[in-house]
């Protein structure tokens, strides 16, 4: 069992993810949104690359069945029902609904991971549940950090480290690449999370948009026991 880490969506190639269990992380905030929505009874989440595609697909549904969610540059998209705040995806809003979603980084990363054997959605809020499931799979793993506009993102990296750290507590003989070892070490040295992620560029962007409550929620550790999986068409509860 080997664990590798990809530092942003720009570095995803078919040969890296092919036949691997792929774990996609966009902690601030797409994968936190998806995990929250699925946990709150959302029937499925369907990710799209573009706003136009999302709006076009929405026409195929009855308006009472579907919710449009997402962002561009961390801001709600005009004409959409919800932004990319996980706090908006309450049980009252999403239960039994289909969420059509497009985001700047997260949905792009998901689309590029399609050659993977399985595609798991992870965030800080469900990290332990994901780690447990990965150990059950006992396959080679690639943790994909969505990153920010193609660049490395500190928040995704420490989240991956938390997952690796949790796995190592149960299975010590996992083979780690240098970059996955470093991810684990970063988490080991920064278990309070906030003092680390506050140095991240995306954290500053969120603070400037007054998204402090989203930050507080997204850095909570393993408060959700659900593992969403993407089958190339839709994201559902595993």
Swiss-Prot record:
<comment type="similarity">
    <text>Belongs to the ComB family.</text>
</comment>
<dbReference type="InterPro" id="IPR005238">
    <property type="entry name" value="ComB-like"/>
</dbReference>
<keyword id="KW-0460">Magnesium</keyword>
<dbReference type="InterPro" id="IPR036702">
    <property type="entry name" value="ComB-like_sf"/>
</dbReference>
<dbReference type="GO" id="GO:0050532">
    <property type="term" value="F:2-phosphosulfolactate phosphatase activity"/>
</dbReference>
<dbReference type="GO" id="GO:0000287">
    <property type="term" value="F:magnesium ion binding"/>
</dbReference>
<dbReference type="GO" id="GO:0050545">
    <property type="term" value="F:sulfopyruvate decarboxylase activity"/>
</dbReference>
<dbReference type="Pfam" id="PF04029">
    <property type="entry name" value="2-ph_phosp"/>
</dbReference>
<keyword id="KW-0378">Hydrolase</keyword>
<protein>
    <recommendedName>
        <fullName>Probable 2-phosphosulfolactate phosphatase</fullName>
        <ecNumber>3.1.3.71</ecNumber>
    </recommendedName>
</protein>
């Amino acid at each position: 069992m080997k664990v590798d880490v990809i530092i942003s969506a720009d570095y995803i190639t078919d040969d890296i993810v092919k036949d691997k269990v792929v774990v996609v992380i966009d902690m601030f905030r797409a994968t936190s949104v998806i995990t929250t929505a699925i946990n709150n009874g959302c029937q499925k989440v369907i990710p799209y690359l573009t706003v136009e595609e999302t709006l076009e697909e929405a026409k195929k549904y009855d308006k009472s069945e579907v919710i449009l969610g997402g962002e561009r540059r961390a801001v709600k998209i005009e004409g959409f029902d919800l932004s990319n705040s996980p706090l908006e995806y309450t049980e009252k809003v999403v239960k039994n609904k289909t969420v059509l979603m497009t985001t700047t980084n997260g949905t792009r990363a998901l689309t590029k991971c399609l050659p993977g054997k399985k595609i798991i959605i992870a965030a800080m809020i469900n990290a332990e549940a994901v780690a447990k499931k990965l150990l059950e799979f006992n396959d080679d793993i690639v943790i994909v950090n969505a990153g920010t506009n193609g660049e490395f993102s500190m928040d995704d990296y420490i989240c991956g480290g938390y997952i690796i750290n949790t796995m190592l507590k149960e299975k010590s003989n996992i083979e780690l690449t240098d970059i996955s070892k470093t991810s684990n070490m970063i988490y080991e040295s920064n278990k309070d999370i906030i003092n680390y992620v506050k140095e991240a560029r995306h954290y500053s962007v969120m603070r400037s948009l007054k998204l402090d409550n989203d930050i507080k929620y997204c850095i909570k550790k393993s408060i959700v026991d659900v593992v969403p999986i993407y089958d190339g068409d839709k994201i559902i509860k595993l």
